[in-house]
Amino acid sequence: LSLTRSGDNQLYTVDATTALNRTSRFRVENLLAGGNLRTVTDPNGLVNTTLLGLDNSRTITSPDGTVTRTTQYPDPRFGLQAPLSNLTVTTPNGLVSTLTTTRSATLSDPDDIFSLTAMVDMLILNGRAFASVYDPALLKFTDTTPEGRQTVSFIDSQGRILKEQVSGLEDTDFSYDVRGRLTSVAQGAGASERLSSISYNPNGFVASVTDPLNRSVQFQYDPTGRVTKQILPDLREINFTYDANGNVSSITPPGRPAHDFQYTQVDLESEYRPPAIGLPEHRTQFFYDLDKKPTSIVRPDGLSIAFNYDVGGRLINFVLPRG
Protein backbone atom coordinates (compact mmCIF):
# COMPACT_ATOMS: atom_id res chain seq x y z
CA LEU A 1 0.00 0.00 0.00
CA SER A 2 1.38 3.39 -1.01
CA LEU A 3 0.13 6.78 0.22
CA THR A 4 0.42 10.08 -1.65
CA ARG A 5 -0.63 13.40 -0.12
CA SER A 6 -1.18 16.73 -1.85
CA GLY A 7 -2.67 20.11 -0.89
CA ASP A 8 -2.47 22.19 2.28
CA ASN A 9 -4.18 22.48 5.63
CA GLN A 10 -7.25 24.07 4.05
CA LEU A 11 -7.77 21.35 1.46
CA TYR A 12 -5.75 18.19 1.01
CA THR A 13 -6.10 14.75 -0.53
CA VAL A 14 -4.51 11.41 0.22
CA ASP A 15 -4.41 8.67 -2.42
CA ALA A 16 -4.05 5.10 -1.15
CA THR A 17 -2.96 2.69 -3.88
CA THR A 18 -2.87 -1.06 -3.39
CA ALA A 19 -0.49 -3.60 -4.89
CA LEU A 20 -2.98 -4.19 -7.73
CA ASN A 21 -3.12 -0.43 -8.46
CA ARG A 22 -6.56 0.08 -6.94
CA THR A 23 -6.69 3.66 -5.69
CA SER A 24 -8.94 5.16 -3.03
CA ARG A 25 -8.92 8.94 -2.59
CA PHE A 26 -9.49 10.68 0.74
CA ARG A 27 -10.26 14.40 0.49
CA VAL A 28 -10.50 16.72 3.51
CA GLU A 29 -11.71 20.32 3.19
CA ASN A 30 -11.94 22.82 6.04
CA LEU A 31 -14.89 24.95 4.96
CA LEU A 32 -14.63 28.74 5.08
CA ALA A 33 -18.01 28.97 6.79
CA GLY A 34 -16.86 26.48 9.40
CA GLY A 35 -17.06 22.76 9.60
CA ASN A 36 -15.25 20.04 7.76
CA LEU A 37 -16.11 18.05 4.63
CA ARG A 38 -14.53 14.65 4.12
CA THR A 39 -14.93 12.80 0.84
CA VAL A 40 -13.90 9.21 0.16
CA THR A 41 -13.85 7.94 -3.43
CA ASP A 42 -13.30 4.21 -3.76
CA PRO A 43 -11.55 2.48 -6.71
CA ASN A 44 -14.91 2.11 -8.50
CA GLY A 45 -15.59 5.84 -8.32
CA LEU A 46 -18.29 5.55 -5.65
CA VAL A 47 -18.32 8.56 -3.33
CA ASN A 48 -19.04 8.72 0.39
CA THR A 49 -19.12 12.14 2.07
CA THR A 50 -19.07 13.15 5.74
CA LEU A 51 -19.92 16.71 6.78
CA LEU A 52 -18.89 17.73 10.28
CA GLY A 53 -20.89 20.80 11.29
CA LEU A 54 -20.22 23.53 13.81
CA ASP A 55 -23.35 22.40 15.67
CA ASN A 56 -21.72 19.07 16.61
CA SER A 57 -23.56 17.32 13.78
CA ARG A 58 -22.26 14.64 11.45
CA THR A 59 -23.97 14.04 8.11
CA ILE A 60 -22.91 11.00 6.09
CA THR A 61 -24.10 10.56 2.51
CA SER A 62 -23.59 7.07 1.10
CA PRO A 63 -23.07 6.29 -2.59
CA ASP A 64 -26.70 5.11 -2.90
CA GLY A 65 -27.99 8.43 -1.55
CA THR A 66 -28.78 7.28 1.98
CA VAL A 67 -28.23 10.15 4.42
CA THR A 68 -27.32 9.46 8.04
CA ARG A 69 -27.33 12.51 10.32
CA THR A 70 -26.12 12.47 13.90
CA THR A 71 -26.49 15.46 16.20
CA GLN A 72 -24.96 15.79 19.65
CA TYR A 73 -26.10 17.78 22.64
CA PRO A 74 -24.71 18.14 26.15
CA ASP A 75 -25.28 15.75 29.02
CA PRO A 76 -27.09 17.56 31.88
CA ARG A 77 -24.13 16.96 34.22
CA PHE A 78 -20.99 16.56 32.12
CA GLY A 79 -21.89 18.68 29.10
CA LEU A 80 -20.20 17.83 25.81
CA GLN A 81 -17.51 15.84 27.61
CA ALA A 82 -20.09 13.02 27.59
CA PRO A 83 -22.49 14.04 24.81
CA LEU A 84 -25.83 12.47 24.01
CA SER A 85 -26.84 12.02 20.38
CA ASN A 86 -29.82 11.79 18.07
CA LEU A 87 -29.80 9.86 14.81
CA THR A 88 -31.82 10.22 11.62
CA VAL A 89 -31.46 7.91 8.60
CA THR A 90 -33.17 8.89 5.34
CA THR A 91 -33.19 6.47 2.40
CA PRO A 92 -33.27 7.58 -1.27
CA ASN A 93 -36.97 6.68 -1.53
CA GLY A 94 -37.86 8.89 1.43
CA LEU A 95 -38.12 6.39 4.29
CA VAL A 96 -36.98 7.93 7.57
CA SER A 97 -35.80 6.25 10.77
CA THR A 98 -35.21 8.35 13.88
CA LEU A 99 -33.49 7.59 17.16
CA THR A 100 -33.81 10.20 19.90
CA THR A 101 -32.14 10.11 23.32
CA THR A 102 -32.90 12.30 26.31
CA ARG A 103 -31.53 12.37 29.85
CA SER A 104 -32.70 14.15 32.96
CA ALA A 105 -30.69 14.30 36.18
CA THR A 106 -31.72 15.50 39.63
CA LEU A 107 -29.01 16.85 41.93
CA SER A 108 -29.28 17.51 45.67
CA ASP A 109 -26.68 20.25 45.20
CA PRO A 110 -26.83 22.05 41.83
CA ASP A 111 -23.14 22.92 42.14
CA ASP A 112 -22.06 19.30 42.68
CA ILE A 113 -22.48 17.06 39.64
CA PHE A 114 -21.90 13.99 41.81
CA SER A 115 -24.81 14.73 44.16
CA LEU A 116 -27.12 12.70 41.93
CA THR A 117 -30.45 11.66 43.43
CA ALA A 118 -32.21 10.42 40.27
CA MET A 119 -31.55 9.99 36.56
CA VAL A 120 -33.87 9.04 33.72
CA ASP A 121 -32.75 8.08 30.21
CA MET A 122 -35.24 7.83 27.36
CA LEU A 123 -34.48 6.27 23.99
CA ILE A 124 -37.18 6.70 21.36
CA LEU A 125 -36.82 4.61 18.21
CA ASN A 126 -39.37 5.53 15.54
CA GLY A 127 -41.85 6.52 18.22
CA ARG A 128 -41.25 3.51 20.48
CA ALA A 129 -39.89 4.49 23.89
CA PHE A 130 -37.33 2.60 25.97
CA ALA A 131 -36.80 3.96 29.48
CA SER A 132 -33.98 3.51 31.99
CA VAL A 133 -34.41 4.89 35.52
CA TYR A 134 -31.45 4.99 37.90
CA ASP A 135 -31.81 5.23 41.68
CA PRO A 136 -28.39 6.18 43.13
CA ALA A 137 -29.48 5.46 46.72
CA LEU A 138 -30.19 1.82 45.86
CA LEU A 139 -27.63 1.56 43.02
CA LYS A 140 -30.53 0.31 40.93
CA PHE A 141 -31.41 0.51 37.23
CA THR A 142 -34.95 -0.18 36.02
CA ASP A 143 -35.18 -0.67 32.25
CA THR A 144 -38.58 -0.75 30.55
CA THR A 145 -39.29 -1.73 26.93
CA PRO A 146 -42.09 -0.26 24.78
CA GLU A 147 -44.12 -3.41 25.59
CA GLY A 148 -43.78 -2.74 29.31
CA ARG A 149 -41.33 -5.54 30.08
CA GLN A 150 -38.92 -4.62 32.86
CA THR A 151 -35.39 -5.61 33.81
CA VAL A 152 -34.05 -4.48 37.17
CA SER A 153 -30.29 -4.42 37.74
CA PHE A 154 -28.35 -3.70 40.91
CA ILE A 155 -24.72 -2.58 40.74
CA ASP A 156 -21.94 -2.07 43.24
CA SER A 157 -19.95 1.10 43.87
CA GLN A 158 -17.58 0.11 41.04
CA GLY A 159 -20.41 -0.09 38.50
CA ARG A 160 -20.33 -3.90 38.31
CA ILE A 161 -23.66 -5.66 38.04
CA LEU A 162 -24.51 -7.67 41.18
CA LYS A 163 -28.06 -8.81 40.52
CA GLU A 164 -30.43 -8.89 37.58
CA GLN A 165 -34.17 -9.40 37.89
CA VAL A 166 -36.35 -10.19 34.88
CA SER A 167 -40.07 -10.65 35.30
CA GLY A 168 -41.03 -14.33 35.19
CA LEU A 169 -37.47 -15.59 35.64
CA GLU A 170 -35.30 -16.43 38.63
CA ASP A 171 -32.94 -13.69 39.80
CA THR A 172 -29.35 -13.84 38.54
CA ASP A 173 -26.50 -12.96 40.91
CA PHE A 174 -22.93 -12.08 39.90
CA SER A 175 -19.79 -12.34 42.07
CA TYR A 176 -16.29 -10.93 41.58
CA ASP A 177 -12.84 -11.42 43.07
CA VAL A 178 -10.69 -8.70 44.62
CA ARG A 179 -9.33 -7.84 41.17
CA GLY A 180 -12.80 -7.20 39.79
CA ARG A 181 -12.98 -10.35 37.67
CA LEU A 182 -16.22 -12.27 37.31
CA THR A 183 -16.03 -15.47 39.41
CA SER A 184 -19.59 -16.79 39.43
CA VAL A 185 -23.04 -16.43 37.94
CA ALA A 186 -25.91 -17.95 39.92
CA GLN A 187 -29.56 -18.13 38.91
CA GLY A 188 -32.20 -19.21 41.38
CA ALA A 189 -31.70 -20.27 44.99
CA GLY A 190 -31.57 -23.40 47.10
CA ALA A 191 -31.99 -26.74 45.34
CA SER A 192 -32.94 -25.01 42.08
CA GLU A 193 -29.85 -22.81 41.95
CA ARG A 194 -27.83 -22.99 38.75
CA LEU A 195 -24.26 -21.92 39.48
CA SER A 196 -21.49 -21.33 36.94
CA SER A 197 -18.03 -20.38 38.14
CA ILE A 198 -14.76 -19.13 36.66
CA SER A 199 -11.27 -19.40 38.15
CA TYR A 200 -8.07 -17.68 37.05
CA ASN A 201 -4.40 -18.60 37.03
CA PRO A 202 -1.70 -16.39 38.62
CA ASN A 203 -1.20 -14.58 35.30
CA GLY A 204 -4.84 -13.52 35.16
CA PHE A 205 -6.00 -15.90 32.42
CA VAL A 206 -9.08 -18.10 32.78
CA ALA A 207 -7.95 -21.38 34.37
CA SER A 208 -11.29 -23.18 34.46
CA VAL A 209 -14.99 -22.77 33.78
CA THR A 210 -17.49 -24.90 35.70
CA ASP A 211 -21.12 -25.20 34.60
CA PRO A 212 -24.24 -25.79 36.78
CA LEU A 213 -23.80 -29.58 36.41
CA ASN A 214 -20.32 -29.26 37.97
CA ARG A 215 -18.62 -30.06 34.67
CA SER A 216 -15.31 -28.23 34.50
CA VAL A 217 -13.22 -27.26 31.49
CA GLN A 218 -9.61 -26.30 32.23
CA PHE A 219 -7.14 -24.25 30.19
CA GLN A 220 -3.34 -24.16 30.06
CA TYR A 221 -1.28 -21.41 28.41
CA ASP A 222 2.17 -20.69 27.05
CA PRO A 223 4.24 -17.76 28.40
CA THR A 224 2.59 -15.35 25.92
CA GLY A 225 -0.94 -16.19 27.06
CA ARG A 226 -2.00 -18.45 24.19
CA VAL A 227 -4.08 -21.52 25.00
CA THR A 228 -1.96 -24.66 24.55
CA LYS A 229 -4.27 -27.21 26.14
CA GLN A 230 -7.97 -27.50 26.87
CA ILE A 231 -8.89 -30.23 29.35
CA LEU A 232 -12.48 -31.43 29.03
CA PRO A 233 -14.67 -32.54 31.97
CA ASP A 234 -13.79 -36.21 31.31
CA LEU A 235 -10.06 -35.25 31.36
CA ARG A 236 -9.63 -35.69 27.61
CA GLU A 237 -7.34 -33.06 26.12
CA ILE A 238 -7.33 -30.78 23.08
CA ASN A 239 -3.86 -29.44 22.24
CA PHE A 240 -2.94 -26.30 20.29
CA THR A 241 0.36 -25.23 18.74
CA TYR A 242 1.36 -21.95 17.07
CA ASP A 243 3.85 -20.77 14.48
CA ALA A 244 6.40 -18.01 15.04
CA ASN A 245 3.82 -15.34 14.11
CA GLY A 246 1.22 -16.59 16.59
CA ASN A 247 -1.03 -18.31 14.05
CA VAL A 248 -2.61 -21.61 15.11
CA SER A 249 -0.49 -24.27 13.39
CA SER A 250 -2.23 -27.37 14.72
CA ILE A 251 -5.22 -28.53 16.73
CA THR A 252 -5.14 -32.06 18.12
CA PRO A 253 -8.50 -33.46 19.31
CA PRO A 254 -8.61 -36.04 22.11
CA GLY A 255 -7.15 -39.35 20.94
CA ARG A 256 -6.96 -38.20 17.31
CA PRO A 257 -4.22 -37.04 14.93
CA ALA A 258 -3.56 -33.34 14.52
CA HIS A 259 -5.27 -30.95 12.12
CA ASP A 260 -2.51 -28.77 10.62
CA PHE A 261 -2.64 -25.22 9.25
CA GLN A 262 -0.16 -23.27 7.15
CA TYR A 263 -0.05 -19.57 6.31
CA THR A 264 1.31 -17.16 3.73
CA GLN A 265 4.05 -14.64 4.47
CA VAL A 266 1.33 -12.14 5.42
CA ASP A 267 -0.42 -14.58 7.80
CA LEU A 268 -3.32 -15.58 5.58
CA GLU A 269 -4.31 -19.24 5.81
CA SER A 270 -2.80 -21.05 2.83
CA GLU A 271 -3.44 -24.69 3.69
CA TYR A 272 -5.57 -26.85 5.93
CA ARG A 273 -4.42 -30.42 6.30
CA PRO A 274 -6.72 -32.78 8.24
CA PRO A 275 -5.55 -36.20 9.39
CA ALA A 276 -4.94 -38.65 6.55
CA ILE A 277 -8.06 -40.55 5.54
CA GLY A 278 -6.61 -42.76 2.81
CA LEU A 279 -7.11 -40.37 -0.12
CA PRO A 280 -4.28 -39.37 -2.49
CA GLU A 281 -4.83 -35.73 -1.49
CA HIS A 282 -6.61 -34.55 1.64
CA ARG A 283 -5.51 -30.94 2.07
CA THR A 284 -7.44 -27.78 1.21
CA GLN A 285 -5.44 -24.89 -0.27
CA PHE A 286 -6.24 -21.17 -0.26
CA PHE A 287 -4.89 -18.63 -2.77
CA TYR A 288 -4.98 -14.82 -2.70
CA ASP A 289 -4.20 -11.85 -4.91
CA LEU A 290 -1.74 -9.10 -4.00
CA ASP A 291 -4.52 -7.20 -2.22
CA LYS A 292 -5.03 -10.20 0.11
CA LYS A 293 -8.40 -11.08 -1.38
CA PRO A 294 -9.11 -14.81 -1.85
CA THR A 295 -8.95 -15.86 -5.49
CA SER A 296 -9.48 -19.60 -5.23
CA ILE A 297 -9.90 -22.53 -2.88
CA VAL A 298 -8.61 -25.89 -4.08
CA ARG A 299 -10.45 -28.77 -2.46
CA PRO A 300 -8.98 -32.20 -1.69
CA ASP A 301 -10.71 -33.61 -4.79
CA GLY A 302 -8.72 -31.18 -6.97
CA LEU A 303 -11.72 -29.03 -7.88
CA SER A 304 -11.58 -25.29 -7.23
CA ILE A 305 -13.86 -22.53 -6.01
CA ALA A 306 -13.01 -19.31 -7.87
CA PHE A 307 -13.67 -15.74 -6.68
CA ASN A 308 -14.00 -12.91 -9.21
CA TYR A 309 -13.75 -9.17 -8.53
CA ASP A 310 -14.44 -5.97 -10.44
CA VAL A 311 -11.74 -3.37 -11.13
CA GLY A 312 -12.36 -1.80 -7.72
CA GLY A 313 -11.86 -5.04 -5.84
CA ARG A 314 -15.52 -5.78 -5.07
CA LEU A 315 -16.60 -9.40 -5.22
CA ILE A 316 -18.70 -10.01 -8.35
CA ASN A 317 -19.31 -13.72 -8.04
CA PHE A 318 -17.80 -17.01 -7.03
CA VAL A 319 -17.85 -20.13 -9.14
CA LEU A 320 -18.52 -23.51 -7.57
CA PRO A 321 -17.38 -26.75 -9.23
CA ARG A 322 -20.16 -29.13 -10.17
CA GLY A 323 -18.01 -32.21 -10.59
Regions from the PLM with identified roles:
Residues 1-42, 46-62, 66-211, 215-232, ...:
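Beta-strand elements of repeat-based all-beta scaffolds
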